[in-house]
Swiss-Prot record:
Protein location: Cell inner membrane
Source organism superkingdom: Bacteria
Keyword field contains Ubl conjugation: no
Cited function: NDH-1 shuttles electrons from NADH, via FMN and iron-sulfur (Fe-S) centers, to quinones in the respiratory chain. The immediate electron acceptor for the enzyme in this species is believed to be ubiquinone. Couples the redox reaction to proton translocation (for every two electrons transferred, four hydrogen ions are translocated across the cytoplasmic membrane), and thus conserves the redox energy in a proton gradient.
UniProt GO cellular component terms: NADH dehydrogenase complex; plasma membrane
Organism encoding this protein: Cronobacter sakazakii (strain ATCC BAA-894) (Enterobacter sakazakii)
GO biological process: ATP synthesis coupled electron transport
Catalytic activity: a quinone + NADH + 5 H(+)(in) = a quinol + NAD(+) + 4 H(+)(out)
Protein name: NADH-quinone oxidoreductase subunit K
Disulphide bridges: none
Main subcellular location: membrane
InterPro entries in the record: NADH_UbQ_OxRdtase_chain4L/K (IPR001133), NUOK/Mnh_C1-like (IPR039428)
EC number per UniProt: 7.1.1.-
Amino acid sequence: MIPLQHGLILAAILFVLGLTGLVIRRNLLFMLIGLEIMINAAALAFVVAGSYWGQTDGQIMYILAISLAAAEASIGLALLLQLHRRRQNLNIDSVSEMRG
């Protein structure tokens, strides 16, 4: 059995790594990957806490978070494909210069 502190520290490290990738990178694909890492870190924290207290709620929240991440990834990748077809790059600065 993994102690609660170890699991939560791992989840916090993963969350900070995802947040760092989201803030530092200017490529939308890497920003999407960072967001996925953050969602998985939060889901890991739910599973660790649920395991510690002997509840199945953490696993239920994990399933919900994974389904949310799948929906977010599919929409994000569809937007990335359209952006790449129109602009031929995935730089966030080119998105902010849209017409309209």
